[in-house]
Amino acid sequence: MSSYAIVEACGKQMWIEEGKFYDFDKLPFSKGDVFSLSDILLVKMDDSAEIGQPYLTDKYSVELRVLQHFSGPKIRVYKMRSKKKTRKTFGHRSKLTRVLVQSISKKGVAQTTCFM
């Protein structure tokens, strides 16, 4: 198994691995931008694991590249009061950003990147 990390982004904690893509709530970056996450909770590399208390910001970095912005699936909500003629339907589509995890690396060590 390759290295993985548990990071906190957009108010959620996510398990991420190198070379895979994930969907986050809309991020303020353009398509193709590369950025790094600062809230890293846990990192597992090869045979060692490190847990932050609460974060590993100064030891590790996670590089991500924005692939695209898109709308998520449509969520439909139907409200009704029984025995009344009150009915209401509404819904929404969340704005999402798809990112590719390029590398999970220790700071100060040569970075390995994933080419896709």
Curated annotation (Swiss-Prot):
GO molecular-function term, one example from the UniProt record: structural constituent of ribosome
Principal location class: plastid
Subcellular location: Plastid, Chloroplast
Ribonucleoprotein in keyword set: yes
Record's keyword terms, sorted: Chloroplast, Plastid, Ribonucleoprotein, Ribosomal protein, RNA-binding, rRNA-binding
GO annotation, biological process: translation
Key word Plastid present: yes
Pfam families per record: Ribosomal_L21p (PF00829)
CC annotations in GO: chloroplast; ribonucleoprotein complex; ribosome
InterPro entries for this protein: bL21-like, bL21-like_sf, Ribosomal_bL21
Oligomer status and interactors: Part of the 50S ribosomal subunit.
Protein role: This protein binds to 23S rRNA.
NCBIfam families reported in the protein's UniProt record: L21
PANTHER family: 50S RIBOSOMAL PROTEIN L21, LARGE RIBOSOMAL SUBUNIT PROTEIN BL21M
Family under the similarity heading: Belongs to the bacterial ribosomal protein bL21 family.
Name the UniProt record assigns to this protein: Large ribosomal subunit protein bL21c
